[in-house]
């Protein structure tokens, strides 16, 4: 399944390890290290980064959506898969 992370950008749900807030120093360091390694994907369309998505391929994806919004979308997909709708 695919998750919309904003502005028409989508990520495979099975590849997501974590969705975290970008404000902490460790997350800023992780973002900088990913940029140096060529593993940073900026999906913010020039807007403020409001969440960081960590994938199993060691890519770091920046999103302009709040962590809670992405979580709601993931939960909605899981409900549909489980047949709860």
Curated annotation (Swiss-Prot):
HAMAP family: RemA. It comes from the Bacteria. Belongs to the RemA family. InterPro entries: RemA-like (IPR007169). This is Putative regulatory protein THEYE_A0405. It comes from Thermodesulfovibrio yellowstonii (strain ATCC 51303 / DSM 11347 / YP87).
């Amino acid at each position: 399944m695919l998750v919309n992370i904003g502005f028409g950008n989508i990520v495979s749900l099975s590849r997501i390890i974590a969705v975290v807030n970008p404000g902490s120093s460790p997350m800023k360091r992780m973002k900088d290290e990913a940029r140096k390694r060529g593993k940073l994907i900026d999906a913010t369309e020039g807007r403020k980064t409001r969440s960081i998505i960590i994938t199993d391929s060691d890519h770091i994806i920046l999103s302009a959506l709040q962590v809670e919004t992405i979580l709601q979308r993931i939960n909605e997909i899981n409900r549909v898969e489980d047949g709860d709708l």
